[in-house]
Every structure is written in structure tokens, then in C-alpha cells.
Amino acid sequence: MLIYVFLFFIFLMFIRISVIDWREHAIYDKDIVLTMVFVALYKVFYGDFFSSFYGLAMGLIVGLLIFSVVYKVYGFEAFGQGDVILLAALGFFLDMSFLHYFAFAMMLNGILGVLMLLLSRKHAEDIELAYAPVLLVWLPLYFYFNKPSLWAIYNLLFS
């Protein structure tokens, strides 16, 4: 029963981060730290705490790669430090399945982005979109499908 309490607070923090990022285009360190504390407690009691560091490292590496590419392309911080740390926190939570979720979310975000461009009267360069809500909105769906692997995601979308 306690597992659901931890999961509730983790998802509540992800919702809080998403709403604040949507409104203010900022992710606060205190929210990320509190999320990491809830994830660490959850992992200590119900998961493999040490294997979660693999996911944390993967999230951090992916976040830093995106940050550096976006900074080189745009010349300013369009993908910020909060987004990088959010990916690390998400990796810590999802551990080994982080890359699978990231691919899952990016595929669905690609479809969403094309629909936004088709339905919007704005040009692509005029659309500002906060990253946290777009990344985290698919998390319940990912858990609903029982955290599928990349191959299962491919079969789900294209079969």
C-alpha cells in the first residue's frame, strides 16, 4: 500500500513541475530535489536503488547532449538546466527503461508536433513549448502499456 503513496507523490511532483514549466518556462531546483527524494525513497523500499543510477546517468547524458546541440543550433538556452536535471530525475525513476520511455515519448511528441503545426496558424519558429509537460504527459500511458521496450513500442505503433 505504501508503494502507491510514493508513486502518488512522485506523479504529483511531475505534475507540479509540468504546470510550472508550462506557465513560467522554468523548472525549479527545489521541485527536482523533492522529486529525487521521493524517487530515492521509492527505490530504497520497492526497487533496486543502485541500478537506478544507470537510468540517472542515461537521463543526464541524454539531457546534456540535447542541451549542447540546442545551444549550438539556437545560440541561447532553449533547453535549460532544469530540463537536463528533469531528464536525470526521470531516468532515476525509470532506471533501465528510461531510454525506452524517452523513445516512446519522442515518437508521440513527433506526432503531436506535426498536428500542432498543421492546426496552428503560426510558423514553426514562432511556437514556444515547455519541455516538461510534453515529456511527462506520456508517463501514465507508458505505465498503462506496462513499460514496453523499444521493440514493443515499434510493434504497437506500426503493426
Residue ranges, per PLM feature:
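A membrane-topology feature that recognizes alpha-helical transmembrane segments
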Residues: 1-159
